[in-house]
Amino acid sequence: MRYTTSFIGLCFLIFLLKNLVNGGLIRECDYTMEGYGPCGPNGRSLCLDTFWKTPPSPGLSKNLEGCRCEDRGKRPPIFTGLSHTCRCCWSYGGGSDD
């Protein structure tokens, strides 16, 4: 049993090192999107909807880690109403897409 556990641990380490050498997991943060209206109680889902409508880089398999909604107040005088900003973080596998 001891050798089996060691073998599984060794395989996991090889897998981990292989991913790190080939680019591994790339984490991007602060993808910023602006939108109309205040955040309100459903600000997180508002940002998630916006994120999936305009993904940062199409063609990559992304794992969204989270979004944060921030009220910006009034827009410039040309526009009317309130606005918000969404900041999102996501991760994706890198290295082999080029």
Swiss-Prot record:
Which range is the signal sequence, renumbered to this chain? 1-23
One GO CC term, this protein:
extracellular region
Give the principal location in a single coarse category.
Answer: secreted
Keyword flag Disulfide bond: yes
One Gene Ontology term from the biological process aspect of the record = defense response to fungus
The alphabetized UniProt keywords are: Antimicrobial, Disulfide bond, Fungicide, Plant defense, Secreted, Signal
Q: Which InterPro entries does this one have?
A: SCRL
Record bears the keyword Signal = yes
Which locations, inside or outside the cell, does it occupy?
Answer: Secreted
Q: Which cysteines are joined by disulfide bonds?
A: 29-89, 39-69, 47-86, 67-88
Instruction: Give the similarity note.
Output: Belongs to the DEFL family.
Q: What is this protein called?
A: Putative defensin-like protein 239
| Organism per entry | Arabidopsis thaliana
Its gene name is: SCRL17
